[in-house]
Amino acid sequence: MSTINTDTSEAMPHISVNAQYIKDLSLENPSAPSSLAALDQRPQIDLSLDINITNLSEENFYEVELNIEAIARNEKYKLFQIELKYAGVFNLINIDSEQHPILLSVHCPAMIFPFARKIIASCTQDAGFQPLMIDPIDFGALYHKKMSEHQN
């Protein structure tokens, strides 16, 4: 028989997701319906991603916002442009403040990214295109690249 320690004074460090939400969503389908007839070729996708972190007024509560923009083009048309700001509110519980930057820049975005990816796939499909399935993102590599750029 095992027992579970419910004493919160010695609670294990963890990240709590308090909320997830769409802050802003825009989809443009500027060349429809002509562009929908030209779907026999694979479009070129230009993708950009940015992460914004805001320390909320409460202690150890942060908003982590993913800003994702994708533009699809073929030889003739700009097929679509989608912009999504998707955020989560995170509480870093019993975690040393020195670890906050990497957790907020790597682990928190990785937790909410699948939801943002699904929204983009659904919206592009609803616009008449194949769903845009964004490849998984290595937030750790992005963080380390950004840190090395700041040091130079």
UniProtKB/Swiss-Prot annotation:
Record's subcellular location: Cytoplasm
One GO term describing the cellular component: cytoplasm
Molecular function terms, GO-annotated: unfolded protein binding
A GO BP annotation: protein folding
The UniProt record lists the keyword Methyltransferase: no
Family: Belongs to the SecB family.
Assembly and binders: Homotetramer, a dimer of dimers. One homotetramer interacts with 1 SecA dimer.
Protein name: Protein-export protein SecB
Originating organism: Rickettsia prowazekii (strain Madrid E)
